């Protein structure tokens, strides 16, 4: 085991029994051979479960939609990448030469994916309790600042944060029609989300309101919220 990996283990707060599992978690798909995508898939599922379980216990009065919004904030790519930078994770990644030259070790999505892969690797190397303990320790500061006030953000912000938590492209809004007299117009907007086959629609007395309605419809279509949240 190299000194560099030992240093990373100290930062993570976990020592791997199987070093190959750790190396695989740090291997981007641009690198020759096996990569961390399967571990990332597993780690993402574990992270979402652990975050959801912790929120369920922490906020017993919260509604489903509120819990979903809080979880989206906790597990979004921006948050995970910030944690990864705190571990200097980019210094340990195995990247292909092209990705390395383009600064992939600094890229938010690559850092976030690698952290999820490490979660999956810890689970396989140890057990669920150990993975849970590490996740909660890493996210302790994030949990400390959470309140239900955070769920009062507008639908566009909530949709954006949800998509970021899934490393998806941001939604695109388009005004498709404007009806009525200049002093009493109704704006019709479509919202395109990569996870949905159909565009969500909204209307309102201003473009901003119509976009908010379309975003709210998209959240419902995604199953993140329901009409009562």
Curated annotation (Swiss-Prot):
GO terms for molecular function: double-stranded RNA binding; metal ion binding; ribonuclease III activity; rRNA binding. It is found in: Cytoplasm. GO terms for biological process: mRNA processing; regulation of gene expression; rRNA processing; tRNA processing. It is an enzyme of class 3 (hydrolase). Pfam families: dsrm (PF00035), Ribonucleas_3_3 (PF14622). Disulfide bonds: none annotated. Residues 154-224 form the DRBM domain. Its EC number is 3.1.26.3. Residues 5-127 form the RNase III domain. Keywords: Cytoplasm, Endonuclease, Hydrolase, Magnesium, Metal-binding, mRNA processing, Nuclease, RNA-binding, rRNA processing, rRNA-binding, tRNA processing. The active site is at 44, 116. The keyword Membrane does not apply. Mg(2+) binds at residues 40, 113, 116. It catalyses: Endonucleolytic cleavage to 5'-phosphomonoester. Its main location: cytoplasm. Digests double-stranded RNA. Involved in the processing of primary rRNA transcript to yield the immediate precursors to the large and small rRNAs (23S and 16S). Processes some mRNAs, and tRNAs when they are encoded in the rRNA operon. Processes pre-crRNA and tracrRNA of type II CRISPR loci if present in the organism. Homodimer. Belongs to the ribonuclease III family. HAMAP family: RNase_III. This is Ribonuclease 3. It comes from Pseudomonas putida (strain ATCC 47054 / DSM 6125 / CFBP 8728 / NCIMB 11950 / KT2440). The gene is rnc.
């Amino acid at each position: 085991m190299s000194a560099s990996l030992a240093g990373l283990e100290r930062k993570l707060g976990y020592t791997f029994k199987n070093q190959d599992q750790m190396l695989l978690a740090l291997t981007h798909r641009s690198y020759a051979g096996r990569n961390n995508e399967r571990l990332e898939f597993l780690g993402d599922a574990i992270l979402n479960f652990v975050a959801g379980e912790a929120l369920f216990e922490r906020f017993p009065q919260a509604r489903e939609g509120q819990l979903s919004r809080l979880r989206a904030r906790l597990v979004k790519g921006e948050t995970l990448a910030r944690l990864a930078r705190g571990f200097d994770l980019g210094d340990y990644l195995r990247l292909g030469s092209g990705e390395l030259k383009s600064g992939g070790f600094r890229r938010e999505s690559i850092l976030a994916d690698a952290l999820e892969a490490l979660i999956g690797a810890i689970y396989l190397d140890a057990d669920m309790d150990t993975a849970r303990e590490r996740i909660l320790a890493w996210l302790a500061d994030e949990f400390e600042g959470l309140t239900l006030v955070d769920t009062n953000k507008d639908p566009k912000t909530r949709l954006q944060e949800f998509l970021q938590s899934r490393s998806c492209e941001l939604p695109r809004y388009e005004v498709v029609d404007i009806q009525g007299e200049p002093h009493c117009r109704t704006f019709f907007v479509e919202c395109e989300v990569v996870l949905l086959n159909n565009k969500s629609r909204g209307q309102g007395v201003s473009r901003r309101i119509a976009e908010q309605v379309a975003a709210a419809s998209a959240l419902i279509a995604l199953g993140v919220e329901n009409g009562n949240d």
